[in-house]
Amino acid sequence: DKVVLVTGVSSGIGLGVAKEFARAGAHVAGCSRKSPDDASVQAFREVVEQEGVRSFYRPADVTDAEELKGFVEDTVRTFGRIDMVVSNAGMNVFEGAEGCTEERWHYNLDLNLASHWRLARLCKPYLEKSGEGVLLLMTSNHAFSSIPGCFPYNVTKTAITGLVRSLAI
């Protein structure tokens, strides 16, 4: 019975990842910024639990260090461990370098880069204790090919590659 922690489970890749791990027999802890009674959160719970495994959900903004810490701690309280982390939460910002404000720049760095580091740091002791811990940080083709008009997103996705290499040392 593996336990997988996934961020951004209310839609898209995060929901798909949760479904596939549940299908493989893993219990899934998920977070997003959505309220627990939101239809998208109910969909997360349903796709996981229909596979005969347990789900846990806690609303958490991954840019808020305390909310992220609470999510990790509640996951461990619920399941007793974490075997795998899929740090998926993020968003694209369609702005060129010249139009990107300081505020948008820093928010993008926080959401699409720093949140991955925070989550890795928080989960590291549990992954090591697992003995088979796996950490997946979601990136995209923007890490390898900059797309015009996606300035801050391109930068953060490229930086995730460096973050992964540094964490692997």
Show the residue positions of the predicted features.
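Substrate-binding pocket helix/loop in short-chain dehydrogenase/reductase
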Residues: 96-97, 101-109
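Residue(s) in the substrate-gating loop at a strand-loop-helix junction
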Residues: 140
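Conserved glycine-rich Rossmann-like NAD(P)H-binding loop of the short-chain dehydrogenase/reductase
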Residues: 24-41
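Active-site loop-to-helix junction immediately N-terminal to the catalytic Tyr of the SDR YXXXK motif
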Residues: 100, 146-154, 166
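Conserved glycine-rich cofactor-binding loop
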Residues: 10-12
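Active-site helix of classical SDR
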Residues: 120, 156, 164
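Alpha-helical segment proximal to the catalytic Tyr-Lys
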Residues: 125, 169
